[in-house]
Amino acid sequence: MKTQYRAVVVGGGVVGTSLLYHLCKMGWEDSVLLEKLELTSGSTWHAAGLLPLFNMSYSVGKIHKYSVDLYQKLEEETGQPVSFHKNGNLRLARSQERMDEYRRYSGTASTIGVPYHLIGPEEIKKLWPFAEVGDLVGALYHPDDGHVAPVDLTMALAKGARMNGGEIYTQTEVTGIRQKPNDEWVVSTAQGDITCEVVISCTGNYARETGRMVGLELPVVPVEHQYIVTGAIPELADYNQGGNPELAVL
């Protein structure tokens, strides 16, 4: 590990590796990522990996579309599988108000170039044969949505970053960050200090701790989410074994 880099990325999850990948793609090859344990050992490893294109914001929607497009070509670029499944996404509406929201979104989707369909209960039943559609008004269907394996994606981004000149060091905990009078930054680790122009924190659950190293109190806290794993469902098992396409994400 060198003692001087242009940029130091702190955190080895999907955000950190993506940032390093894109820095190197932009010509900042003299960049390094530091991870205190192993890649994906934070919140990335147990993320659901869903890729929702739906967003009412034009700017965020563009990022979503870019991400989905990137994930589909990343395996070809790096040779590292990302386990991308383009099985689509169904957003169900039980009220006319919800369908109106989806119609408002259609303008954003059309501007960004995101394929979508506003469909009724009969079409929902065709896409999801096991759905009870009696109380549904309709749905927003994104055929290009799907899901990805977060760990595989992280490894592909890391490989892509290395292919473009980036460096990654695991088991390298950042213990301090300070700024010099000439505006350079010094990042302290158990393996020694690194001087750089820019430090980017991608530490997820540890964002507050990282912020405190530079005198910032970031209003970031971990939030509990539900992740339910069911037992085998005979109808779905028969459907999958019958060679049918993967059902859309609901």
Placement of each model-derived feature along the sequence:
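Beta1/beta-strand and adjacent pyrophosphate-binding region of the FAD-binding site
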Residues: M1-V15, V32
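Flavin-dependent oxidoreductases
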Residues: S18, I177-L250
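Gly/Ala-rich phosphate-binding loop of Rossmann-like dinucleotide-binding domains
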Residues: L20, C24-K25, G160
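Glycine-rich FAD pyrophosphate-binding loop
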Residues: C24-W45
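Short loop/edge segments at beta-strand edges and connector loops
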Residues: E35, G120-P121, T170-T172
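Dinucleotide-binding Rossmann-like beta1-alpha1 core, especially the glycine-rich loop
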Residues: G49-L127, L247
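A short, glycine/Asx- and small/polar-enriched loop/turn
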Residues: E97, W128-L136, R178-V186
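Helical element adjacent to the flavin cofactor pocket in flavoenzyme catalytic cores
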Residues: L140-V198, C202, Y206
